[in-house]
Amino acid sequence: MNSYSDAATQPEAPAVWLLPPALYVLRPEATALLDQVNERVWATVDPALLETIRLRIAWLLGNTAGMQARNALARVPEQKVAELPRYATSPLFSALDRDGIAFAEQFVIDVSGTSQESLDALRGHLGADRLRDFATSVYLVEFTQRLQQVAAVLLPSMPDRSDAGRSEQRPASLGELLGSYQDAVVRSTALDPVTTELVRLRCARTHNCRICQTLRLADADAAGVDGEMTSKIDFYETSDLAEPHKIALRITDAFILRPDALSDDVVGPARATFSPEQLAELCLDITKWSTQKIHVALGTDGTDGLPVNEDGVVLFGFQPDGSVAGYWADPEHPVVVRTRTKR
């Protein structure tokens, strides 16, 4: 993909991806990697196109701070910003702008509704080899904003860090950097496996990711997560799931549906139930699991070739370094997986 690094990595560039200070304190490794991914995405995709998409997503999410922020080096004229509500007909927007923004809107609102026509249009503009990076960029500007909104309300106030939002770049592709971020998220084990799995499956069902709905975390399976428990996720409020699990699912829903509507009725019990470290892990977990939206949008979320067992489940686990240990059908399959705390 063409590089826009000269425009996107200058020291004076405003870090529109800057996270709430508490996240940098509670999860320094993962947030440093997320900063790297965000820096790289602005150097990979045309920053002017990405800025218009970021602003449109900010409006969709009710993110007032995001709508007011600007990445100055994207150089999007304010006249064009003012025309964003009319992007489909305004002469200020190119065909690529229109198709890119329309794709982003569908990605945010209901990613499973992404049409082949939309993908074909973008493929025509960008080329097949650049489509995944574009979808990844939309995911990043969406979920960075969701993370900013939710963490700012959910986590305690902490002093700003002067170095936040800037990080030393590593020589890696956008996909490789995103993978490193996901591995770092997985390495945290403050949450118990049952909570983690219920949250993961809530994300999968909301985004309608076929492969993620089929998967089952091995440590959660060993901790008692079965078909009966997972059947309660869709109607968790009226179920007999434990209250901590319901609280975690309420946070998940706010995060992936209406981050601007996270209420005191959710925040208060969350802070009383979970430690700041656990809440930070929960927020980052949701961003990690939601990378599934990239696969759903591109139609690469199929289960072909996976070892599905008689319960329709594929077990999987992680190595201590956060990488996937493998996929298997047998619960007794020997594999090294990370250890987790239990509530």
Sequence positions of predicted segments:
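Hydrophobic alpha-helical segments
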Residues: 1-343
